[in-house]
């Protein structure tokens, strides 16, 4: 339609629910020294407090363990690579440390979360001196679970708390049986006749070498295979997205939230393990978001160039499926930081998820998370775009991000957008209003920006969202508002 000056719809926008809610800037996906980060929890909380950040959503690595074993005795022959993670060092200790930093920094909400690697798979062979571990970064972030018993039992490859007994358990335990004949050889003296000239002497000897070898193999097998449970998600098979969906469902049952992490980022590397070249790789996997269900959100804005959230692409397909009741849970977009340390130009706090809350509490943040009351933000250290309001109205009814507006066919509807700048200044901004995967309005102006779009609801389930951009890297991506008959 057309761009409208700032005060034209001031009364409407101030009355909208978005304006009434408090903006709580948060840094989502942060690692500390408890896992793979380089800053302590206190240092991170200090940065947040100094930067005006209201919440830290920690994503400590849940379990960083990759292993390979030769068949059939995989436990006996396995080689393992591990890095620091909270499951290995103790879930109770992790939650205790978070509680301590909360007491020291009451002005910053610190939410404990984990980054889970649900599954990886091996290809290649050590016999060919070349192996690849795939999908080691196809990860999910988990928040909202503070029960240590539940957190310990998350479905994830390598989790010792979720093992089960299978035929592989029998194979792994089999070499331990060698302790029995080994012990017999060490304990029992064997009689031998030995001729000395014309005389025959009976000599009693134990089989020290053979007995020691058998006992050593048995003891090593016992230690490596104990408690003889097998991996529910063996990395030697292609299980697709089974483990990822199991994790999503387990978290949903526990009342938590899940986030697909960096779906369009690529990760690869290689190192020598003895004579074997071992590489790892994770290709962009945005299409997998269309193949999984019931997760809460995905990383929609981060440092990589992305396509999934573009008009008409994967995100709009997901939203269309939700609007038409093909999905029970919509997929919200978040700003994802992935902060480990200050390196390679990495900054703290420039990628944010801004929650729209009615109270500054962990419960309010998680409630906003589940219901899509937040927007993704890429900013600089000095200034940022701010969502003054984003609403869709039908008569006296008004909905904001994450809401569903009910309206009969033929009802006039109006989408209202307000974009401000954190410093109150006039900054160039381009704003796209997306409806059902297509850009229905594209405006250019300066902050404070106000605009509206009018249409008549035709009765088909619909959704609206806003993508606003300023000079690079400034960007603000809202979550959708649904309209249904």
For each predicted feature, which ranges?
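Extended, charged catalytic domains and RNA/DNA-binding interfaces, predominantly
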Residues: 20-485
């Amino acid at each position: 339609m057309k761009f409208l000056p700032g005060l034209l719809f001031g009364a409407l926008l101030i009355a909208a629910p978005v304006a009434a809610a408090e903006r709580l800037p948060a840094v989502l996906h942060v690692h500390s020294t408890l896992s793979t980060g380089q800053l302590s929890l206190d240092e991170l909380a200090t940065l947040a407090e100094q930067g005006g950040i209201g919440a830290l959503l920690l994503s400590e690595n849940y379990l960083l363990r990759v292993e390979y074993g030769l068949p059939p005795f995989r436990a006996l022959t396995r080689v393992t690579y591990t890095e620091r993670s909270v499951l290995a060092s103790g879930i109770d200790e992790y939650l205790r440390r978070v509680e301590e930093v909360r007491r020291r920094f009451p002005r910053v909400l610190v939410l404990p979360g984990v980054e889970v690697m649900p599954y990886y798979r091996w290809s290649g062979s050590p016999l060919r001196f070349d192996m690849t571990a795939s999908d080691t970064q196809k990860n999910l972030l988990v928040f909202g679970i503070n029960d240590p018993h539940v957190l310990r039992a998350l479905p994830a490859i390598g989790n010792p708390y979720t093992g089960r007994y299978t035929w592989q358990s029998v194979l792994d335990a089999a070499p331990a049986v060698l302790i029995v004949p080994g012990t017999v050889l060490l304990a029992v003296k064997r009689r031998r006749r030995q001729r000395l000239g014309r005389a025959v002497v009976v000599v009693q000897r134990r089989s020290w070498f053979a007995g020691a070898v058998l006992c050593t193999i048995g003891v090593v097998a016992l230690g490596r295979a104990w408690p003889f449970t097998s991996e529910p998600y063996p990395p030697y098979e292609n299980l697709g997205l089974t483990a990822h969906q199991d994790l999503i469902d387990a978290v949903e049952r526990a009342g938590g939230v899940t986030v697909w992490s960096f779906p369009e980022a690529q990760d690869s590397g290689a190192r020598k393990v003895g004579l074997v070249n071992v590489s790892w790789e994770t290709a962009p996997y945005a299409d997998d978001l269309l193949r999984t269900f019931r997760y809460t959100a995905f990383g929609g804005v981060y440092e990589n160039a992305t396509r999934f959230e573009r008009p008409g692409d994967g995100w709009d397909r997901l939203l269309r499926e939700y609007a038409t009741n093909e999905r029970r849970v919509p997929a919200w977009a978040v700003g994802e930081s992935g902060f480990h340390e200050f390196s390679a130009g990495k900054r703290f706090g420039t990628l944010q998820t801004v929650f729209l809350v009615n109270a500054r509490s962990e419960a309010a943040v998680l409630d906003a998370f589940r219901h899509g009351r937040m927007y993704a933000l890429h900013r600089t250290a000095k200034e940022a775009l701010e969502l003054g309001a984003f609403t869709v109205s039908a008569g006296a009814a008004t909905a904001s991000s994450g809401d569903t507006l009910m309206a009969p066919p033929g009802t006039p509807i109006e989408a209202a957008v307000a974009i401000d700048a954190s410093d109150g200044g006039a900054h160039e901004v381009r704003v796209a209003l997306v409806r059902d995967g297509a850009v229905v309005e594209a405006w250019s102006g300066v902050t404070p920006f106000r605009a509206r779009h009018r249409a008549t609801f035709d009765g088909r389930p619909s959704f609206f969202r806003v993508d606003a951009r300023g000079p690079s890297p400034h960007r603000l991506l809202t979550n959708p508002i649904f309209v249904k008959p």
